[in-house]
C-alpha cells in the first residue's frame, strides 16, 4: 500500500514536471530567462516530495465537497461546545480525551466566561495527569499558573476560586504528593519560591516517611528537591527506604527505565557519608567482608558511570530486559545505520571506538577489548542494586531483599533443584512463588529437557513436600500444560497414568488424564497440541466428543482447526448460553456458531438478564458491530429487553450510539406514536405494572455477511446471506426518549409531546425523561434551550419540566441561556420574577428561584450567580444571603 501511495505521489510530481517544462521548444535565450523561475518551481517540487502520502489523500477527501459533507454529517457540531464541558475530571475528561490539554489551553486563552476548570479538585486531577517533562507541558503549566493567580490580567472574572499564589504551601504539598516534577519545577520558577520556603513546607506538610516506600516517581522528585537544595535535614531517603523490589527490579521493565531507576537510586544518597554516620552511631561493625562488599559496590558504580546511555540503541533502550536477555530484540551500534539481529551475544560498541572507526572508514579493525557485552552490563546493574540495598537497609529488613528467579536463570548457571532451594524453599514460597518458578523453568529454552523431566518427576513424587501444598499441584499442572511442549506434556501424562495404576482408585491423588486435558485445554496455543491429543488421547477425554462444550475454551486462533478435528469423526459442538456471557470472547464464538449450524448446536434459552449482560460487557469492549451481527442472526424465543440503551451514566454510554442507530433505523415517529397510544389506553385503570410496562418494537434487520470463504460456508451450511429478518425488543418510555435524543431526533420528541401530552404530562409519568436526574447527564446547552423554549410556549402542564430544565442550566453553568431569557422580547423574562399575590403572571415562588441561584453558586459559576441575583426581585435580605454564600467560596 505504501508503495502504491508513493507511486501516486511520483506520478503527481511527474505531471508537475511536464507542466513546468511545456515550453521546451522555445528558443535557448527564452529558456535562460525562464531558468530562475524553473529552478524555483523545481524547489517546490522537492518540498512536495517530503509530504506524507496519507496527507495527500487527506486533502483529496477534504476538498471533495460530497465526501466532506457526508463525513461531517455524523458530527453534532451545533449541539456540543465549550458550554457542555463542565469540569475536567481525571477519568472522563483528562484521560478520556486525547486532546484534553489542548482543550484546556484553548479555553483559558479564549477568555471565555464558561471556564472548564471549576474547582481545586479539577486542578489536582490535572497535576496527577500531566507529568511529562517536555516544552508543551511546561508551557501549559505556565499558562495555568498565570491564569489562576491574583496577578492575572484576564478581563474575564474567573468562575473558579483558585488562586495559586494565595496558598503556595498547599500547592507545593500537592505537587510533591502527586510526584509531579514538571509542575513543581514550573511552579517554583513562576512564583520565584526560594529553597528555604520549600524546606519549610516539607517540614510541616510532608512527613519523612513519605519517601519510605520508594517508587520511581518518588526517587525522581526526591533527587529534584535535593538538586535545588530544598530537602530539610529530617528528610532522608535512607534508611527509611522500603522499595518493592519485585516491581523495581522486574525484568519486564524497559531497559531505559531500569537505567533511570538505578541512577535515581544511586544519586539519592552518598554511600560513604552514610557509612561514616552509621560507624559514628555504632550501627555498623567494620568487618572485612563488609569492607570487601562495599569496595565491590563502589567499583561497579564507577564502571557503570563510564557507560553512557547514548551508547545503547533505541531498540535496546525501548526493549524489556527480559527480551534483551532472550535475544528477541534487534540490536545495532549507536552510530552505524545498519541493524543486525543477534542470537548468541549482545554487544554495544563504545562511542570512542565508533568515532575512530568512522574516521578510518574501516569497520573491520574494531578492537575486541572495546566491545561491551550487554548481558554483563545488565548483570552489573542488578548486582549494584542488590549490594546497594545490602548496605542501606536496616538489618531487620534485609531478609525481604531476595534475588528473583530470572536473575538466576540468566546470570547464574545452577541446577533446577538449587534454584528451587534459593528462590522458593528458602523463603517458604507462596503459591505465587511456585507458579512463577514452574512456568519459568518449563518454558526456558536454555534448560535441558532432562532437567525438566526430573522436575516433573520430583513434584509428582512429593520431593518438594516441605513447601508444596496439595492445592499447589494445580499450579504445577497449569505450568506443564502452558508450556505447550508436546514432549513435556506427554511425559507428564504418562507419569500420571502410571501413578494412578499403582494407587487404589478410591484414593487416587491426581485427576484423570481426560479431566486434566479438558481442564487445561484453554492453554493450547498451537495446532500440533490439538493433533497430539486427537491422535493419542481422543478416547480418554471429552475434548472431541459429540455435543461437547469445550469449544468455549479453545483459543479463537485455533477454533477452526478444532472444528475440523471434531467434525472429521462426525461430531458437533454445543454452545449453551447460560453462564458464559461474561467470557470476553463468548460473543465472537456465538456469532461464529450461528453462522455454522451444521457444526454447532445452540440453546438460546437464556434469561433476559443473560442477554443484557452479554450486550453490556461487549459494548464496554468496543464490540458494537459484533453485537449487531448477533442481533441480526440470533433466533430469540422472546423479545429482548434492551433497557441498557438508556444508560446515561455509564462510562461507555457514547458507544451505545452505533447500536441505537441500528435498532431505530426504520422505526418512525408515527409508529412510536401508535405504540404510545396503546400504552396510554392501559393507564386508565391505574394499574402500576401496566402504566410502567415496556413498549415492544419490531425492527427489520438483514442477516450479516458471512465472514467465511464461499467454499467453507457451503461445507458447514451457513445461513442465507441478505435475508431479511424481524427482531423484537422492549424498552421503557424513558429509554425510548433517551434513544431519540441520542439520535438527534429531538424534533420527534417534541412531535410526541404535541400529539400525546396525556402520556408525558400526567403525574405518574413525571419521572420520564425530563426529570433532572435523567436529562442532566445527556443534555447539551443547545438542546436544553430548545426544551426550555418548547415548555415556555406550552405552559399548560409543563411548569415542572420547565423548572427542572432551568435548574439544570444553572447547575451546568449555561449562562447564555439565562441571558437569552432576560433579553427576550417574547416576555419570557417573567420566568425569573417571584410569584406574589400581586404578580400571578410569574410561575415560581422565592424559594424555587433561590434554589436555581444556589445551584449556580455550588457549581462556582459566579458570573451567572450575580446575573440572577441582580435580575430576580429578591428582597434585600435575600440578596445579601446569596452574596455571602459567594464570598465564602471565594
Swiss-Prot record:
Lineage per the UniProt record: Eukaryota, Amoebozoa, Evosea, Eumycetozoa, Dictyostelia
Region (Disordered): 1-39
Biased composition regions of type Basic and acidic residues, renumbered to the chain: 1-35
Family per record: Belongs to the UPF0746 family.
Annotated organism of origin: Dictyostelium discoideum (Social amoeba)
Top-level taxon of the source organism: Eukaryota
PANTHER family to which the protein is assigned, alphabetical: UPF0746 PROTEIN DDB_G0280785-RELATED (PTHR32488:SF86)
Protein name listed in UniProt: UPF0746 protein DDB_G0280811
UniProt cross-references to InterPro entries, sorted A to Z: UPF0746_actin_org
